[in-house]
Amino acid sequence: MGKKKILSEEEIADMVLPTANDVLGVAMRLLGFDRVLVKCQDGHERLCRIRGKMKRRVWIRQGDIVLVSPWDFQSDKRGDVIWRYKRNQVEWLRRKGYLTLQA
């Protein structure tokens, strides 16, 4: 059996939680050119753009849990990926009731 991943206090402090406008989702397909198809918790599939701050620093894979900020226009179809959660952060989100989707 593997070791249980323990979430440290500084990882919780650095973690970005969803606000009223943001939605959690699962990265379904990588489309290239910094675009990802994301299935969001509100039932919509959005074509999301990886924002410039994350492009080369954070690599998103299929099945990752991400935080999406829908655009002001075309909010049901488009959005920006603003955060990717690590595995232990996803477990914390599930325990606290933020995440109901299965990856």
Where are these regions (language model features)?
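OB-fold/S1-family single-stranded nucleic acid-binding modules
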Residues: 72-99
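Long, charged, low-complexity intrinsically disordered regions
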Residues: 2-7, 93-103
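Short nucleic-acid-contacting surface segments enriched for D/E, G, S/T with interspersed K/R
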Residues: 54-67
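Short, structured beta-strand/loop micro-motifs enriched in basic residues and often containing a Trp
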Residues: 42-52
